[in-house]
């Protein structure tokens, strides 16, 4: 399948899901939106679940490129920075990646359907696990470079990732409700660095 056709199918699916809800979108509707026959759609994707999973992977990679997120060289990332600088940079990058228009719209659909759709729940779990694993790698590197100290880096990474995830949702909800976003995320990062400083 050409990248152009793949993107066209993914964007059509995203638009339909945003308007009708993922559970209400059929392969037939997607084919009609793209202007192809339903059997042709099955030449590209075996099922709607496969299409949604592929959409997640595609949009995530697109968002990473747009947010300029690539492989991390911890030595250069840490050079001349405090622990707080590093956490602000990495959390800010993740936040920016998820605010990319297509990724943001995808998450709105997935989050609204995760209690009803096993596929949506699977994607939320997958993204959360990616966030936890990336945080573990970051914390091990920060400990090796003596930027922070953790008694249990794995549990600290889990706690940190879930707290940041929750605070990002909270910030989104504040903004969506028409309120000014608070500084709770930055306050948390400051507190976290103080609690885990190298002594």
At which residue positions do the language-model features occur?
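N-terminal positioning helix adjacent to the helix-turn-helix/winged-helix DNA-binding module
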Residues: 4-5, 9-12
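Hydrophobic/aromatic residues within well-ordered alpha-helical segments
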Residues: 5, 48, 55, 59-63, ...
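Helix-turn-helix
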Residues: 8, 16-58
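Short helix-capping/turn signature of helix-turn-helix
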Residues: 22, 45, 109-116
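Hydrophobic alpha-helical connector segments
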Residues: 54, 69-100, 156-160, 182
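Amphipathic alpha-helical packing segments from all-alpha helical-bundle domains
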Residues: 64, 85, 97-111, 118-144
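C-terminal peripheral helix-coil segments that are non-catalytic and often amphipathic
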Residues: 89, 93, 137-144, 162-199
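All-alpha amphipathic helical-bundle segments outside canonical DNA-binding/catalytic cores
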Residues: 122-128, 144-161
């Amino acid at each position: 399948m050409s990248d152009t056709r793949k993107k066209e199918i993914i964007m059509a699916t995203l638009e339909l899901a945003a308007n009708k809800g993922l559970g209400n979108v059929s392969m037939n509707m997607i084919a009609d939106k793209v202007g192809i026959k339903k059997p042709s759609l099955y030449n590209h994707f075996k099922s709607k679940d496969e299409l949604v999973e592929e959409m997640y992977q595609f949009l995530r990679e697109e968002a990473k490129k747009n947010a300029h997120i690539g492989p991390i060289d911890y030595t250069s990332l840490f050079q001349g920075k405090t622990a707080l600088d590093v956490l602000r940079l990495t959390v800010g990058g993740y936040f920016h990646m998820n605010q990319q228009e297509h990724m943001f719209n995808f998450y709105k659909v997935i989050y609204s359907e995760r209690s009803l759709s096993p596929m949506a729940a699977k994607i939320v779990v997958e993204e959360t696990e990616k966030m936890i694993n990336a945080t573990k790698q970051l914390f091990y590197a920060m400990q090796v470079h003596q930027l922070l100290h953790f008694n249990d880096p794995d549990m600290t990474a889990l706690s940190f990732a879930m707290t940041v995830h929750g605070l990002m949702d909270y910030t989104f909800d504040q903004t969506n409700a028409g309120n000014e976003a608070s500084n709770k995320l930055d306050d948390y990062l400051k507190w976290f660095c103080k609690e885990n400083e190298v002594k």
